From Swiss-Prot:
The lineage of its organism: Eukaryota, Viridiplantae, Streptophyta, Embryophyta, Tracheophyta. The chain crosses the membrane at residues 196-216, 222-242, 246-266, 288-308, 310-330, 336-356, 369-389, 454-474, 532-552, 555-575, 590-610, 642-662. Residues 65-74 have a biased composition (Polar residues). Residues 15-25 have a biased composition (Gly residues). Expressed in leaf primordia and vasculature of pedicels, rosette leaves, sepals, carpels and siliques. Expressed in the root central cylinder. Residues 1-28, 58-167 are annotated as: Disordered. NCBIfam families: NCS2_1. GO terms for cellular component: membrane. Residues 75-89, 108-132, 142-151 have a biased composition (Basic and acidic residues). This is Nucleobase-ascorbate transporter 11. It comes from Arabidopsis thaliana (Mouse-ear cress).
Amino acid sequence: MDSGSGFDPDTGNNKGNGSGGGNGYGERKFGAFFKRVEPFLPKKDLNPRDLRSWAKKTGFVSDYSGETSTSTRTKFGESSDFDLPKGRDQVVTGSSHKTEIDPILGRNRPEIEHVTGSEPVSREEEERRLNRNEATPETENEGGKINKDLENGFYYPGGGGESSEDGQWPKPILMKFGLRDNPGFVPLIYYGLQHYLSLVGSLVFIPLVIVPAMDGSDKDTASVISTMLLLTGVTTILHCYFGTRLPLVQGSSFVYLAPVLVVINSEEFRNLTEHKFRDTMRELQGAIIVGSLFQCILGFSGLMSLLLRFINPVVVAPTVAAVGLAFFSYGFPQAGTCVEISVPLILLLLIFTLYLRGVSLFGHRLFRIYAVPLSALLIWTYAFFLTVGGAYDYRGCNADIPSSNILIDECKKHVYTMKHCRTDASNAWRTASWVRIPYPFQWGFPNFHMRTSIIMIFVSLVASVDSVGTYHSASMIVNAKRPTRGIVSRGIALEGFCSLLAGIWGSGTGSTTLTENIHTINITKVASRRALVIGAMFLIVLSFLGKLGAILASIPQALAASVLCFIWALTVSLGLSNLRYTQTASFRNITIVGVSLFLGLSIPAYFQQYQPLSSLILPSYYIPFGAASSGPFQTGIEQLDFAMNAVLSLNMVVTFLLAFILDNTVPGSKEERGVYVWTRAEDMQMDPEMRADYSLPRKFAQIFGCRCC
């Protein structure tokens, strides 16, 4: 450049000639015509997101490392300003998320045009921009990205979403119908029934396990099934209106199944000869009522909001997994009583859910949605043809005669097979009424004892932890912001009230949120509350049909056990899937989960090895549930000994206690632990969409004087 030119490289203006004269420059030194150049210092912390002069002047937006332009973000629905309840295709205005650098550091378009002109940029503005750049974090690890996205409510983990091929974060799940969508009355009926049909294994198979264990008749089994259908409908409607208001079915949970079997097979109840079913059911009713009251207090008092600070995915994952693993000694040993039915059923379930999961018929993935009812129906039909064809006809053997009255050993074996395999072994159809309305205290007034009440208090705590994980996962799947701690507490309190109803009506187990809801919503892509309410109304009507309960009670026990093997395995996988919110490669996390699961199985096995003296009268698959009366915990206080031996023989309770203590005492960052970050109540008050999703019905809220509850 000519030394006489006064060209300013920043503004592009000529400042005049450099020679002396009347310009006033003659007295200045030659170097005064140019800005002083600072010594060059190499920048070691290079950030590719920092924009250079050309990008600043033109408004260029980088596509580096997952950054997208506005148009790209609109196309794929990955904007942080995305209005989730209205669908991912709608973008609202606002400041962009960290994955996008706005033109010229967040300034609007008129200011961009202003910069590209010939007017100089003031030094103060330049310094302000540089300070703003320095305030931006230069690098972010994956854990930080996940935690930030979770805090903003815009990160959708892999629970149902397909991973992108380029290694980016999974996309949000595109739902057919959102939380408040109303597709019309006829579609609501279809999708409502579809939701409950996909959960049929969890809704009706528990009575097929507990009622025969209590020596109940086939008629009693049909009555308990009808009661469960009624309570499922009522409690689901209550939850959709007064609980968390997420589209979650309430019903008899497997969390309560293991403790119920422990009480049933304890020495005090397994040796009853008269009225064994009614006496045992009344004992269970009293224990469930006490446990439900504890859960109500936990929710309504606000203690649950405090407890939520210590409940994280590292605690939830092994606890829910232990619920399914608790029945590994019951599952196939019971199903193996009729292998010609159980093995084909398990294989068919695996084929439908794994190999044919992508096959669509008439636009519906029937094999994923209806895998359980379709498989059970096909194998039940197959078992019917085996029965009609005489496969289980043994000369001189009658399944109606009690085993104790049969003298021939070979005939005893055949009778055992006939009871578990024949489709006509049940007399529920002949004995059940056409119309039967379940009513409160139908088995008599409940019995209250400290030993069983302590058991159910621990179980209700585990059920609450299970529900917390389900609430969080469901809110992420349905593309809604996560609820506040108060809403979660409200949901837990309502679950306690629902369990209270279950204890009063005598369903045999408590009522809680079914973990399988996550799988159902994920495969049906339907999250409409109205659909669940319509389906629940149908369940209430069907519960009055006594013959329907009789048909379900006629399902062979081997068939029911085979379906439960698959559902319990699904429960394990759904529980472990909560780890996707954490850093799964963390040695801390995998150690806590591994130790909790292993000791959660091993410690109860130590208590279960103290078999009862009368173990010969118990089938092998019931022996692990008979440790309450003969366990090693002996203090001389009979009630306390019974309760502690029973509690420490439950896999899920031991696993929860270990995971809870370890996760909250071993140091770890929030990103590493995947800490649940719930929405603040203040944010909910300012968000009309969130209030519409979670707030109580307006008239009900006005009665209690709460505006945003």
